[in-house]
Amino acid sequence: MSRRIVCLRHGQTRWNVEHRFQGHTDIPLDETGIAQAARSASLLASLKPTKIVSSDLSRAHDTALALGRVTGLPVTVDKELRERGGGEWEGLTGDVMAARWPAEYAAFEPPGGETEVEVATRVSAAMLRWVEEIDDDGLLVVVSHGAALRLGMLAVLGLPRESWHTLGGLGNCSWSVLKQGRKGWRVGEHNAGTLPEPVSSDDKPEFQDDGTR
């Protein structure tokens, strides 16, 4: 066996439904999100995780706590696992962002926010730091956010910047599995869950099902 990382996205929030950029804004799970967290926890518990780490934002932390209750594991909080900072876009929908900042929206670079490279560097460093704390056959669960996890995984996998479009987004309470091998990390599963969940996150429109924010 080799080390594995389960990258679990948080459950649904009201702003997910409204297609608003959440970023660092602390929006809680809605009723659907709470149910999604409980459902994913019952499934992921069967994988016998050895450590759970989470973003400090409540939508991710509460999702992680649901898994912690089932497994009996504590949840460690790490601010480095936060979502991409959206700057002036936080709380806005894609239509508003595109109308006010057409050039920035086309490049998907939020004014006053983080770049993709900054997020990828931040999140991947946290993931790799935490995975070093588990045994060689251990399973780390990282509970975070849509854009943060996609970008972090791309950096962990070592994919070149021009190939970052090849990995799709994660639905609410869906997860991906990274496996460590002799030649590095590889994808074992992507966007897994009980049923496919619509993808609406703080990520580029092409990584969402409906092209909105």
PLM features per residue range, with description:
Residues 5-63, 112-125:
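Loop-to-helix element that buttresses phosphate recognition and phosphoryl-transfer chemistry
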